[in-house]
Amino acid sequence: MSNLQEQLIALGGVFQAAVLVDRIARTGQASEANIGCMLGSLLVRDPKDTLEVFGGDDLNLRDGYRALVGALERDPSSLQREPLRYALSMLGLERQLNKRGDLLDTIGNRLPQIQSQAEHFGLVHENVIASSGALYQDTLSTLRQRIQVHGDMRFLQQASNASKIRALLLAGIRAARLWRQLGGHRWQLVFSRRKLLNELYDMMRTPS
């Protein structure tokens, strides 16, 4: 697997989280498998490659790939505006987080507790989602930049949905961190757009 493919898998994770946040905000619904994939990515330590972070394949990242393609193609008919806004906000928040060793320490110290909960209850159990959401609230929500989520207030006001959204934002920012560690940079989205698209088209044609 090339470094560019590894980067695109990680960036696909950012956009997948963004798509799921938008879906929950607008409809109150999202696939458990998709949510589980993103929450699981928070708990993977020392993966052998980027795919292992997301469960060993990219089946649950395909919606993220499509949203990323829509952003890179700049086609108004395929552009998913809110997911793009959330994804870019997560990339920005990750850069802020990288300067805050105290918050990184808090995240590192609390993830093992969430890991224990996940082993006991399962990845998509409400306790695991609530703990992941609380970790986002106690760390990333304290930064100057905040992500404003738009949607249907009937769904946004439900505590379980709010926790899912925060947990997914945390997972998306973890994917953004991975993308940057692999050499990803926001300028690529502007100046290497065609190269990224060609690689993404190939990845989306390949069965998971």
Swiss-Prot record:
Keywords: Cell inner membrane, Cell membrane, Cytoplasm, Membrane
Keyword RNA-binding: no
Pfam families per the UniProt record, alphabetical: DUF489
Major location (coarse): cytoplasm
Family annotation (SUPFAM superfamilies): YcfC-like (SSF101322)
GO cellular component: cytoplasm; plasma membrane
Membrane topology: Peripheral membrane protein
InterPro entries associated with the record: HflD, HflD-like_sf
Location of the protein in the cell: Cytoplasm; Cell inner membrane
Family recorded in the similarity comment: Belongs to the HflD family.
Record-linked NCBIfam families: PRK00218.1-2, PRK00218.1-3
Record's protein name: High frequency lysogenization protein HflD homolog
Organism expressing this protein natively: Pseudomonas putida (strain GB-1)
Gene: hflD
